[in-house]
Regions:
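Iron-sulfur cluster-binding electron-transfer modules in prokaryotic oxidoreductases
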Residues: 1-246
Length: 246
């Protein structure tokens, strides 16, 4: 099983430690993982801003870069969801599209494909779990509160394999943090207020850390928190916790 590691542009530039942790975690599990060089953006920012034509060349390059792999794994639910859902439409009649069936968020991959069931790293801290919208409603990482289904949470399942951790959840656990990509730019006041309310609910759990599978949500909440002078809680990606102490 050959795995191609996709590191989204914002992770590469702003949170490279998340990419390193993801690679480290996959290698620790004995997997054949490769990081293809000269990766680029998946095209999501352009497409979400209404410039889908400009996103197509990036989608084509992504396809060419990752077509040889059995799975493409990324530490980003939003980019993973964009590729999975939108590439077939963007590339229809223009370019072969195979990666939409291969790409998975790292949580989804470890839980559903590798089926990790043994202890991972060590992280003796209280963490509050943030369930990102794309992860809940497009990738199925956890059960959405608006649907009457048996509750499940793949992120929590993996975190509970970490030694010493205490996983907490805020009130209204799958409510949006307010980031939403372009939404945070076009509706800054609303986005900021949503982020602040979300951070406050996370802090109310008594957690030392706020964690989640998407660095964009964590980036937004961290920015809002720091602007308000909130420094008594830290922000960390799920992959970093799973890889801690390995």
């Amino acid at each position: 099983m050959k795995i191609g590691l996709f590191i989204p542009c914002y992770v590469d530039v702003v949170y490279p430690q998340v990419g390193v942790a993801t690679y480290k975690l996959l290698k620790h599990l004995g997997l054949d993982v490769t990081y293809p060089l000269n990766q680029t953006c998946c095209g999501q920012p352009m497409a979400n801003a209404g410039f889908e034509k400009q996103a197509i060349p990036l989608a084509e390059k992504f396809e060419d870069k990752f077509k040889e792999f059995d799975y493409v794994v990324a530490p980003s639910v939003s980019c993973t969801a964009f590729i999975k859902i939108n590439y077939p439409r963007l590339l229809e009649g223009k370019h072969e599209c195979t990666t939409s069936d291969k790409i998975m968020d790292v949580v989804e991959f470890l839980h559903d494909v590798i089926k990790v069931d043994h202890p991972l790293g060590t992280f003796p801290h209280k963490v509050s779990l943030h369930n990102s919208c794309h992860g809940v409603r497009e990738l199925g990482l956890s059960s959405p509160s608006e649907e009457h289904v048996t509750p499940f949470n793949k992120i929590k399942d993996l975190l509970n394999l970490v030694e010493g951790i205490q996983v907490l959840e805020p009130e209204r656990p799958d409510e949006c943090c307010g980031f939403g990509g372009m939404f945070s730019v076009e509706e800054t006041a609303v986005s900021t207020r949503m982020g602040l309310e979300k951070v406050r609910r996370h802090i109310a759990t008594g957690a030392e850390y706020i964690t989640g599978p998407d660095s964009s949500c964590l980036m937004h909440m961290q920015g809002v928190a720091r602007k308000q002078g909130i420094t008594d809680v830290q922000f960390i990606h799920v992959a970093q916790i799973l890889a801690a102490g390995l």
